[in-house]
């Protein structure tokens, strides 16, 4: 094969000019036309018996194009191997204006290469290691949340209070005129749960079933409904029903409802503690991992290949559309999401992928079979039948990709924590879990 010069363009972009001998193009085209001749069914001729000259007239141009495309791909692969080029993404091929050699046809291949990844001094990086604990107080708090999730509402004949569920009819008007979304019949909500604007809820508090009143509500300037933002509305509200909240007692029935067959409350609390501890551990590990990944991005000067960033952005866009479809938005698959809105996230992911690959290779951080099994077991632990989940993962090798990736990330986190300056940060239960009430 003739020597080929690799021209450096901007950043990671490279260019090579591929030369395809016309003799090879013509020979391959003739071969393809003969194959077409054997399959061709043309009026006036028996199948496969049409003259080759006629086949060439009918299919010659498309056959030659196919051959050139095939040869270009093959020649580019050969050049990449010979020149030890680490090609990122797919090349684009362009015609060359100066076809000065009558013996060959020239095509330019423009492509990107993977950047050289050099891991900087990790000891100079600061990493935040997040910690949190789960004790009796956190179990009590979680049990209270579980009680609230099982709230029952019972009809009462009294004025409405915060915490009650009310059913109302309402009609709102701005400057005496009704507006879109401003009216409803038998609308149910819980007072004090911030489901409605504060002035609206305050107007309902103290009302009894059967009463009606007008309530003035000022919509905030940043209200999500742009047509009413910053405006004042008068709502005519009729209260139809008041129901008082009743929380279940923490007893055997409550424990059974949470899956404790014998209703033992102590066992229930242990199960709650185990589940909450697992979730807290997952969340603090995620925060620590995020800090480690940020440190790696600081430690490595890296320009991610544009082709890979674009591919990842497209993947993220498709993922978002699929999520919309899964949520019931049937036409979401046709949404035209601009890729620019995903570029920053895509660039981060591609960069981290390159850095982690280098780090794992240099420091032998590939996970062991036992580590992957541990990740799968952790996944399965929260399900009713853990063994069924484990069997599902191991029934198809491709399903182990996610657990393997998590095991790799865990090894990377441990490695970086062993090298960097680690600052421990203890978080409260509420800080880890977010506001839950």
Curated annotation (Swiss-Prot):
GO terms for cellular component: cytoplasm. The lineage of its organism: Bacteria, Pseudomonadati, Pseudomonadota, Betaproteobacteria, Neisseriales. It is found in: Cytoplasm. This is Trigger factor. The keyword Cell division applies. It comes from the Bacteria. Pfam families: FKBP_C, Trigger_C, Trigger_N. One of its GO terms (molecular function) is ribosome binding. Its EC number is 5.2.1.8. Keywords: Cell cycle, Cell division, Chaperone, Cytoplasm, Isomerase, Rotamase. NCBIfam families: tig. PANTHER family: TRIGGER FACTOR CHAPERONE AND PEPTIDYL-PROLYL CIS/TRANS ISOMERASE (PTHR30560), TRIGGER FACTOR-LIKE PROTEIN TIG, CHLOROPLASTIC (PTHR30560:SF3). It comes from Neisseria meningitidis serogroup A / serotype 4A (strain DSM 15465 / Z2491).
